[in-house]
Structures are given as C-alpha cells and as structure tokens.
C-alpha cells in the first residue's frame, strides 16, 4: 500500500469514494465523517474469489476505508463499528445485524453461521416410537384375552363353534335363536326400513344398449307382493343380471318403468329402498368381519336405534350366518390370508342385511357355499319374508330344499320372460305344455335344459298365492327410509374412524411412505449441503452495489422446483392408494345410499395423519442438511401444504384411472407441476407468451414463491430484493396469500 492511498491495490485507478455512511449488515471500523466509506480495486486473490459462482465474498476489506459485509458467524450492530462473535443459541449468516434466535432444540454453538434444527428430528423419533407402540401393543393383550376366553369355554364345557357365542355375563346364544332375533329386528311398522305393504311392479321393461343395439331384456308386466321370496333363474346370458340392475336402480331401462306401490320410482329412489348383494364380494380387506358389518349398520340405521342395539343385532346376524368363528378376522385379499370364498360371500350378504332393508335383491348368494351353508342362508332369508320383506334371489340350478323355499319363480331366456308365477306350480306348468320330467330328478335342472333347447318358449303365468297387503304412500316410505340413516356429520365421523383404523392395519405401506419422505428430504438436503445455508445472494443496497459479488437468483428458484419434485415423489404414489384401492367399495356404498361427501371428507381427514408424518420426516432431514435461514415451523407449513396438494391431485387421478395406471399418471402430473413452477422457463418469459394464467393455476408456482419469500424477507435489509423478484417475476411481498392458493 502506498503512503497516499488507503487501498491494497494502487495501480488500478485508486479508491472510489462513497457519500453514505456504513449501511446495515456491513463492518466499517475505520469510517467516519472525515473518512467516509470508499471502494477499492480488488486484489488478484479477491478478484478470483468474486468470480466464483458460490462462496464469492472476500474475507478482508480491500482498503482501510472500504466497508466489508459482516462475516458469517459474527454480527455487526447498526453503525458497523464492531464485529461481534455470534452468541450461543443464535446463528449469524452473512451480513447479520442482530443475531437470529435459534428454534428450540436446535444446535447453535457460539460463532454459528447457520442453525441445525433438531426439533423436527426429535419429534419424528418420538412419534415413530409412539406409533410402533400403538401398532404392536394390542398383540400381547389380544393373545392373553384369547387364551382366557379359551379357558373359560373349556371350563364351561362348551366349544368355539359357529353355533353360539359366549360373552361376559351372558349365556350361549344358539344359531336358531340368533336367526329368530334377526327376523324380529325386521319390524313390520316400517320404522327400520322394512315398510310392510311395499309392492314392486315392473311394466314393459326392456333394455337395448345403444352400442350393440341388441335387446338384452324384454319383460311383460309383473308384480311382486310384500313378503314374497322370488327366485330368478335362466341360462347364462338370459338377462338375470340386467334385471337386477334395473330393479335396483343401477341401470335405466330403455322402455318401461319400475313402480313401487303403484308410483313410478326413479333410479335414485330405488337405490334408497332396495338393498343389493352383488355377485362380486366387494368388501374392505383391512377391516374385520364385525367391523365391516357394524359400519354398514351404523350408517344405514344409525338414527333409529341405539348403538348398543345395533351391536346386539350385528352379533345375532354374525351368528345366524355362521361367521362367529371369524368375526375378528380380517377380510383379506388376493395373496393375503383372510377369509375363505364362502365366508366372504356370507359377509357380503351380512353387509346388506345390516341395513334392515324392506326389499333385498341377491345376485347368486349361494355360489361358493357348501350345501348346508347355502340352505341355512336361504332359511334365514325365508324367515325375513314373514316380516314383510321382499327377497329377490338370482339362483343357478338350486337344490330341491332351496327351490322349495321359493314362493315365486321368474324364468328368463334370452332376455324374455318364460314363466312368472308360483314356484310350486312351475313343474306342472311345463308338464301342461307337453314337457316331461324324469323321475327323482331336480325339476330346476330339467327346466334349464328345456329353456336351453327352446329359445322362444313362453308359458302361461300361474297366479301367486301371496295376498296383497295395504300399501303405504311411496313418499312416506322414502321419508322413513332416509330418516333412519345416520346424520351426515355422523357418517363423516364413522368414515374418519374407519379410515384411521385402516391406517393402523396398513403399517408396511405406512412405514414405506414415511421412509420415502425421509429419503427424499435427505436427497434434496445433500444437494444443498455445500452451500451452508447460503442459498440466496443479491445486490447490496445503494450506494454499496459495487461491492456486490455475482448474484445467485436462480439457485432459489431451482430450490423451489426441487422441493416440488421430491415432494411429488414422496406423496404421489401414496396418495393414489387413498381412494384408488377403494373405488369399487365407494361405488357400492354410494349406490346403497351412503353420503358420498361424508365418505370423501372422513377419508381425507383420516389421511391427514399420514400427510403430516410424511411432511415432518421430509422437512426434518431437509432442514438438517440444508440449514437455511427459514425457521422449522414455517418450512414445515409450506411443505405440508404441498404434500396435501399432491395427495389431493393423486386422489382425483385415482378416481378416474385404473389402479395400474394411477401411480404413473400421478408421477407425470407431479413432474408437470415442477415444470410449471416458474424456474425454467422463467415466469418473465411465460408472461411474454401470455400464458402466465396456466402457470398460476399450478400449485408449484405458489410453493416456489412462498419458498422465495421465506428466504429473502429476512435479508431485505442487506440485499435489494426487488431486482431478484423482477428477474423471476415473483411476488415477494404476499407470503400470506401463497399458503391460501396452495390449498
């Protein structure tokens, strides 16, 4: 340094004097009114440092009177006369005026330039331990209870059979007694959905799909009276399933109509009145037999009976269907041990009987059942008809005992009505038409053979023996049925409790989801580790702009895009499972009168626990490695909101795509969101294309802007933030709006 210059380098034009005093965030120990701040040419070593993309701030001033930004690990109070080491419990990044207080449980030693937040990691560990205890704790106690129950039964001289159940303080309940209690629960006053006096009439029903143009169903007029047990038979492709869909409101006939008590009934009203047991066993696999049946009963008759009465009824229903031994067993699914095919069929029937319907339609309820079990199911259904319930049963060549239980018989062939009348008179009707039946043969087998050989067969209908009962007004019946259902808010609570219980049973996928969130947080954190929390560098405020090193605006926008990408990877596939695996269950429940809104809200609320835990693990590891200036709560809120967005998008995708394609489409959607985050192409370019509206309907833009604000707001005293915001066309002063738009 020469005697007449204060700069380290004197051969490049000397100092450029400044007219301002020391700005906040700078260290100016030698400046005064007589010696104002000045800018000196950099030394070769400092010049090389300033040419670096990152870590480009020189450690020392280039002259006696040149200000230097306050170094990391120190803070410089207003005036810039002192550079003080950062105290313990605080951290001081580049240009600190007042030390930033560390969040609770963070690692901040004396002289820290960044905060290492450990609160999230500690919360994650504690919550993980708690969840492990919750999931594993019931098992030893369940084993003890099972052992005690076994000793009690052996001591009482009983056994664990399907014919009875033992509970504390109660005697053994027999199969026949349970069947009696079930039939008595179907009261004849209509207050529980039975609505005695209901009469079903179909008039000129036909179905001709527009695509094929082939008539699949063509019926003459028919009436089904209250208390009738009607069997529907016919060869494959005869229109039995089509008839079931029309009668239950699942399909709209091309011509004709279905009448209830003489009034035309719309499809939605039919779904309210009738209970359908589909041929496929559509049941939630992660719940037990009792839990599935109880849920159905609580939703559909929750307003008419006390919960204790519903539980007692479900107990009797389980025993009467021979499910007592498996009442606490999970339903299971393909490749996962659960119930047998016959047991699943009986649970399928119990789900609809739990609603105490006035009309129940069953599509092949005896398929997959052994002879004795099939007969017991038919006997239970027969007992319900004595309470005025209409039972319509699609059966395929039943045994003699089952055929004898039928009151009426409807025979279909190629969609046309062959016979509709008394089941007992059907054989005689065929014989009167000139057909013979072999001795000691099952008449249903012979009838099926005859229809298979004669496509245009039509027999005279024989009158039914069931007398007409006094009819109730259809509107009164509909009101009584809707009145007994659980209120909407109760259905939300029930759906939430069911969804939460499912989460506890899906712990392998639950653990994988949390580990994925933690892994994604580690990956993005490692990509930022070398920056030591210094993710943004802008131009210093005037007149110190010439002291600025190259700016790094793009790093922060890239950070927002990476956040969107990694959160999409962590939350997308998991979000598909929320609704995608239950689509068929939802459709069945929706057609049975369950509130669709209550289901979606309750299910969504039950997933908030998973969303929070995934976001917590992601944020904890991300912040430990990235160590940004952003506080742990603020970063957690932003990440949590984007997790919620991805879950919502994945849920909508799963509702309109197949389970096979859902995860792939969700990942592609997440990548699309990242592309529309405003990083590349920049929002400045997008605005020139007049396509900014497309970017702003994407949640990734809003999380990127929220991330931008969280990093730049605390440094606004040091850097001129406006040029950085204009470079990316970011709204740097509306953080509160970002959270709203993300949601």
From Swiss-Prot:
Entry membrane topology: Multi-pass membrane protein
GO CC terms in record: membrane
GO molecular function: ABC-type transporter activity; ATP binding; ATP hydrolysis activity
SMART domains membership: AAA
Cellular localisation: Membrane
Keyword Membrane listed: yes
Residues listed as glycosylation sites in the UniProt record: 4, 30, 159
Matches recorded under Pfam families: ABC2_membrane_7, ABC_tran
Record InterPro entries: AAA+_ATPase, ABC_transporter-like_ATP-bd, ABC_transporter-like_CS, ABCG_dom, ABCG_transporters, P-loop_NTPase
Domain of life assignment: Eukaryota
The entry's keywords: ATP-binding, Glycoprotein, Membrane, Nucleotide-binding, Transmembrane, Transmembrane helix, Transport
Binding site for ATP: 234-241
Transmembrane stretches, start-end: 124-144, 507-527, 560-580, 611-631, 636-656, 661-681
Major location category of this protein: membrane
Domain annotation ABC transporter: ranges: 200-439
The keyword Transmembrane belongs to this UniProt entry's keyword annotation: yes
Family under the similarity heading: Belongs to the ABC transporter superfamily. ABCG family.
Cited function: ABC-type transporter; part of the cla gene cluster that produces clavatol and ortho-quinone methide. The clavatol biosynthesis cluster cla and the terrestric acid cluster tra are both involved in the production of peniphenones and penilactones.
Name of the protein this chain belongs to: ABC-type transporter claG
Highest classification ranks of the organism: Eukaryota, Fungi, Dikarya, Ascomycota, Pezizomycotina
Gene: claG
């Amino acid at each position: 340094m020469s005697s007449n210059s204060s700069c380290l380098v004197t051969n490049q034009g000397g100092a450029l004097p400044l007219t301002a005093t020391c700005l906040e965030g700078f260290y100016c120990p030698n400046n005064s009114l007589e010696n104002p701040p000045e800018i000196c040419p950099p030394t070769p070593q400092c010049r090389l440092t300033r040419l670096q993309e990152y870590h480009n701030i020189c450690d020392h001033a280039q002259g006696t009177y040149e200000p230097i930004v306050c170094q990391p690990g120190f803070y410089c109070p207003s005036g810039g006369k002192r550079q003080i080491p950062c105290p313990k419990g605080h951290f001081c990044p580049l240009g600190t005026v007042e030390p930033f207080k560390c969040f609770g449980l963070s690692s901040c030693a004396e002289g820290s330039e960044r905060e290492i937040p450990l609160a999230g990691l500690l919360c994650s560990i504690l919550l993980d331990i708690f969840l492990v205890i919750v999931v594993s704790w019931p098992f030893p106690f369940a084993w003890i209870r099972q052992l005690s129950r076994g000793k009690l039964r052996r001591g009482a001289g009983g056994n664990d059979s399907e014919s009875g159940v033992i509970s504390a303080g109660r005697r053994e309940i027999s199969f026949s007694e349970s069947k009696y209690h079930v039939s008595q629960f179907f009261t004849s006053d209509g207050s529980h959905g039975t609505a005695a006096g209901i009469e079903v009439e179909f008039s000129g029903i036909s179905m001709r799909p527009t695509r094929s143009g082939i008539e699949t169903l063509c019926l003459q007029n028919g009436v089904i009276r209250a208390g009738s047990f009607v069997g529907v038979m016919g060869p494959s492709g005869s229109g039995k399933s089509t008839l079931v869909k029309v009668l239950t409101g699942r399909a709209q006939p091309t011509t004709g109509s279905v009448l209830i008590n003489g009034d035309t009934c719309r499809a939605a009203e039919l779904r309210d009145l009738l209970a359908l047991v589909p041929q496929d066993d559509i049941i939630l696999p992660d719940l037990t037999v009792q839990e599935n049946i109880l849920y159905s009963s609580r939703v559909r008759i929750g307003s008419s009976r006390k919960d204790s009465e519903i539980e007692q009824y479900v107990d009797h229903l389980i025993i009467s269907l021979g499910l007592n031994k498996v009442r606490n067993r999970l339903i299971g699914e393909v490749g996962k041990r659960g119930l047998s095919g016959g047991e699943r069929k009986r649970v399928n029937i119990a789900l609809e009987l739990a609603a105490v319907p006035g009309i129940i339609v069953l599509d092949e309820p005896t398929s997959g059942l052994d002879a004795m079990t099939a007969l017991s199911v038919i006997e239970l259904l027969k007992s319900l008809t004595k309470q005025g319930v209409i039972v319509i049963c699609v059966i395929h060549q039943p045994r003699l005992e089952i055929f004898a239980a039928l009151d009426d018989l409807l025979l279909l062939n190629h969609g046309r009505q062959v016979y509709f009348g008394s089941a007992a008179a059907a054989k005689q009707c065929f014989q009167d038409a000139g057909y013979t039946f072999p001795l000691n043969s099952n008449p249903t087998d012979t009838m099926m053979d005859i229809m298979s050989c004669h496509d245009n067969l039509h027999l005279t209908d024989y009158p039914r023996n069931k007398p007409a009962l006094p009819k109730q007004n259809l509107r009164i019946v509909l009101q009584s049925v809707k009145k007994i259902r659980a209120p909407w808010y109760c259905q939300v609570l029930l759906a939430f409790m069911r969804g939460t219980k499912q989460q506890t049973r899906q712990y392998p996928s639950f653990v994988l989801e949390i580990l994925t969130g933690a892994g994604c947080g580690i990956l993005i954190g490692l990509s930022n580790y070398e920056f030591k929390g210094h993710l943004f560098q802008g131009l210093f405020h005037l007149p110190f702009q010439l002291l600025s090193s190259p700016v790094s605006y793009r790093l922060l926008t890239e950070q927002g895009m990476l956040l969107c990408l990694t959160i999409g990877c962590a939350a997308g596939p998991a979000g598909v499972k929320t609704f995608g695996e239950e689509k068929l269950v939802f459709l069945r429940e929706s057609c049975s009168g369950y509130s669709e809104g209550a289901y979606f809200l309750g299910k969504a609320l039950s997933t908030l626990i998973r969303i929070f835990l995934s976001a917590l693990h992601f944020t904890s590891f991300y912040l430990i490695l990235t160590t940004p200036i952003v506080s742990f709560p603020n970063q957690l809120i932003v990440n949590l909101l984007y997790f919620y967005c991805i879950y919502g998008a994945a849920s909508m995708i799963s509702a309109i795509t197949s389970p096979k394609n859902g995860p792939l489409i969700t990942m592609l959607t997440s990548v699309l969101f990242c592309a529309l985050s405003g990083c590349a192409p920049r929002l400045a370019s997008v605005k020139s294309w007049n396509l900014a509206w497309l970017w702003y309907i994407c949640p990734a833009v809003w999380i990127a802007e929220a991330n931008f604000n969280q990093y730049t707001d605390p440094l606004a005293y040091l850097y001129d933030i406006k040029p950085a915001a204009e470079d990316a066309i970011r709204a740097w002063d509306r953080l509160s709006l970002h959270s709203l738009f993300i949601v």
